Amino acid sequence: LDAFAKHEKAQLKMDVLGLEEGRTEYITLDPADHWDGATPTAVTRPAFLAIISSNSLATMLARKGGGGVQGFIIEGPTAGGHNAPPRGTMILNDAGEPIYGERDVVDLCQIAELGLPFWLAGGEGWPERLGKAKAAGAVGIQVGTLFAFSNESGFTAELKRSVLESALRGEVAVRTDPLASPTGYPFKVVTWSGDKDAGIPRKRICDLGYLRTAYVRKDKKISFRCASEPIDDFVKKGGDVAETTGRRCLCNSLMANINIGQFREEGFQETQLLTSGDDLTMIAEFLQGRTSYSAVEVVEYLLAGTVAARA
């Protein structure tokens, strides 16, 4: 960020499976390549807020030189999307979900001692949570689930209405799936009674590649593979067939959630795969019978606790 703010070339170390000892690969970007002789406009370096789920990572980032980070988003395992895996050996409950324990709880007192601002995320979408977060030393909270189903979000109106109607009937569930994501990280998957795509089989196609993994081929060149791509292709690229079990194509399905799912020559459109935080199962308390609401209503709801505390 320091380099880019000055329009200078920068690079990041690239994670590549199978690199021989002593070999390092980087991703490099030189902004000058894209200015085509023009004079770049002065920009301000943006703040870097790192999403973390452990004290050790926060401490390492806070002490890192070269500008480092300006704050933290402390995300718990109840948050939607990808979750950090439990520390230590992963143990699953009877529902096949990772079990999180005391080792996965971030010590907020230690975070506060680092002297950087932080926000809490995951299960924070309740009026009383903002006050509790501030009492613990946080600047505020990060809320995803409530905003994800608001009128202003990118989810299709049909999808939001279907989920909220199911939630009002108590017919929605959120599962932490240890296999769905090709990254290997646990991923929250929503199931609900009104899901029109439930049970529809999908042909394995990998053509977006946002979650692919870089690896070294036999000829020493770098290529990419994905555990959600066609199994034969993945294995031919040196992947372990066991890694393909239970994988879903997050790239295409998440695009379908926002109404830009691809249409295939075979005659089908990519189906949706919804992710959300655990609090979706309790959203009926906020809805109070509604099947739509605005982002403004969410903000007013979240601030109600602090307003009441000041009154």
Predicted regions and their residues:
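Surface cap/lid and interfacial helix-loop subdomains adjacent to catalytic sites
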Residues: 102-113, 125, 135-136, 147, ...
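Glycine-rich phosphate-binding active-site loops on the catalytic face of alpha/beta enzymes
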Residues: 1, 74-83, 127-159
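C-terminal extensions of enzymes
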Residues: 183-311
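Glycine-rich beta-to-alpha transition loops that act as phosphate-gripper elements at the mouths
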Residues: 50-56, 116-129
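Active-site entrance/lid segments in N-terminal catalytic domains of soluble metabolic enzymes
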Residues: 1-113, 283-311
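Hydrophobic faces of well-ordered beta-strands that scaffold small-molecule active sites
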Residues: 48-50, 72-74, 118-122, 141-143
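Alpha-helix initiation/capping motif
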Residues: 54, 125-126, 151, 156, ...
